[in-house]
Amino acid sequence: MRLSFLSVAIRASLAVGISHIFTSQVLADVATNSEDAPETTLDTLVIRSDAYRTTATKTALDPEKTPMSYSRIEQETLQQRQADSVASALRYEPGVSSESRGTVGIFDEYTLRGFKNYSNFYDGMRLPYDGTWNLMPQVDAYATEAVEVLKGPASSLYGYNEPGGMVNQIAKTPKNTPENEIRLRAGTNNLKEIAIDSTGPINDTTNYRMVALAREKDGQMQTTEEKRVLLNPSIEYKPSNNISVLANLYYQDDPHQVPSTPLPSVGTVYKASYGKLDADAYAGDKWNDFSKKVFMPSETINWKINDLLTFKHTLRYTDADAQQKNTYHQGFSEGSDSKLIRTAYTTDEKMTNWATDNQLAYNLITDNTSHNLLLGVDYQKTDSTAKYADAMYNGIPIIDLSDPDYDLFSKTALSLTGYQQTDDIEQSQFGVYLQDEMQWNKLTVVAGLRHDDYKSTTKTTATGSDTKTTVNEANQTSGRLSALYQLDNRFAPYVSYAQSFQPVLGVNYITGEAFKPTTANQVEVGIKYSSADKATKATLSAYDITRKNDKVTAIDWTKQTQTGETTSKGFEISADHRFNDWLNVGVGYGYVDAEITKDEFHPEYVGKMPQQVAKHKASLWAGITPNNKTILNLGVRYQSGMQINQANSDTLPSVTLVDVSGSYQISPTLTAGLNVSNLFDKTYVGSCYDRNNCWMGAERQASVSLTAKF
């Protein structure tokens, strides 16, 4: 029952959160005044520890001096934009197509500079994904201090990755000043949420933080629901200014989430005999469901050995599992444009992962030149099992989209024995990287090189066939060379060359050999600007990416070879300006010209744009502060239509959406908030993979909140 679930979750979260809040208040009273940080008033207060390192370089290099496209979305912005996920956090990021499946929240999916990306990072280390089904650990936006976006290839620091870039979520960490927050939120789709964030000192050397959340709401699609509970305690021990030890635990339980159940293009993109479907249309059944649990403890050591030498070590363990019950369809029954022929399937996935990253940094200064040398060694090992069972259309009832009945499945008679497959996968990666960050007068040069040894062993047992073992390996060296020069007028042009690779699982149908990794390279030029008073910041970048060794279909999806190539050329503009004390405006635009440049088996696809990529994306975000108690925000985002299929036989309509948010400080400790995304409730199709698989865009979501800070 929904109420019983929320009741238990709220009580658990309150018990943990209030106990920590109470503890922090008592201990803060006995803490020495010398531990209290000085109070500073800024437009947006951003506190970063001495150990902070950016995603772009794994160093503390100022973003204005970083010779590549890099941005950071702070927690305050995430809350203003009602972001509960990475995908929603990227709505206003140029060059990024996010929420292409707006009704689905089981994984964070987006394209960066024209390339699909499923691999997210958490505190600088990859969240594991074995490349099979849907078990992808997620970190809720409320437990995230910031989201950092690095565009372009990043394999010289992070190993295998898609060439469009990477997204890194920065965890909330303990602070040495008491801060406590309780937030209540309610909204459309029966949204109910309580969130707690408490931090402060335990004693002179130890700080804690506890982040907890319980959320439930109805899913956008009919009869679906979403529930989440997370606990994220952390503790930092700092016996001196030279060493700190951080222990972090992230636990998330999603007992109910909305699976990815596609709709046909008829009724969504195209008008059917009964008209068009609403945004909450669903081709599934009440039987459909998705659940996931993630348990991630980690520890980080930062050690300042001396003024020139520092060491950072991180170790993380992940234990995750996911169960799915879902349907897909084979098109309409003969003579109908509303009755879908469906089948049912289940997936049962389990995964464990060990990951470590170790960095030694040495600051060498010679005459007018400084070298920040970084030597790193990282390793990760993933063991996973994915079980798949499919009814193969045996006894699965048809659904009539014009008059849907979502309670057609007989759970006792449902047979999933038409086809079954089990994949046992072992993956490992060992990487060594070296980077020199050189600064000479106004010139910054970043040069990096990394070598990776990757291996994946997959044992597949399927109905009607013997067990098959496939071994995919990648021994790859990736590099990056970038330079930026700061002019006297505060403009800073830069140029960058970077490489990436991505392992490909499976066997080449023609050669019988294991697939090789895809490889990519990018050339990027750009210019940055930052005014002396920091009121204006802007970045203009242009890029050219080529990826080789793409998989292409030889006969059908089970028989593939590796002779494809994809290129993506484009440019991005982002600018923020604070006009005065009460008006801030940010604008962004991204142009992506991605196309398939090689496909020997399907020459008709050459020159076509990949699916789920928007060629144009533009946005505007304005923040208004009429007084010291009121904040108003208005956002407008435009996205051009994506292609309906690989052949580009049609283009989806473009869409313009409006978001608003605001807050009012009722008292020094109490603030009321309002957030509305898709203000005018625009019904649109988020994306299609082909004419049989389309997903609606996110409908209007509104919420009110009450936040107590003390």
Where is each model-derived feature located?
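Acidic, small-polar-rich N-terminal luminal/periplasmic segments of exported/outer-membrane proteins
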Residues: 30, 38-177, 182, 500, ...
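Outer-membrane beta-barrel translocator/receptor signature
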Residues: 128-129, 142-145, 156-233, 237-243, ...
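Acidic/polar loop-and-plug regions of large Gram-negative outer-membrane beta-barrel proteins
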Residues: 215, 219, 232-238, 242-304, ...
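Structural signature of Gram-negative outer-membrane beta-barrels, strongest in the C-terminal barrel
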Residues: 238-240, 351, 368-372, 378-382, ...
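Surface-exposed extracellular loop regions of Gram-negative outer-membrane beta-barrel proteins
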Residues: 255-269, 383-385, 480, 484-524, ...
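Face-selective signature of the C-terminal outer-membrane beta-barrel domain
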Residues: 297-320, 342-460
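Membrane-embedded beta-barrel scaffold of Gram-negative outer-membrane proteins
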Residues: 302-304, 308-316, 320-326, 517-600
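Gram-negative outer-membrane beta-barrel transporters
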Residues: 442, 544, 562-647, 671, ...
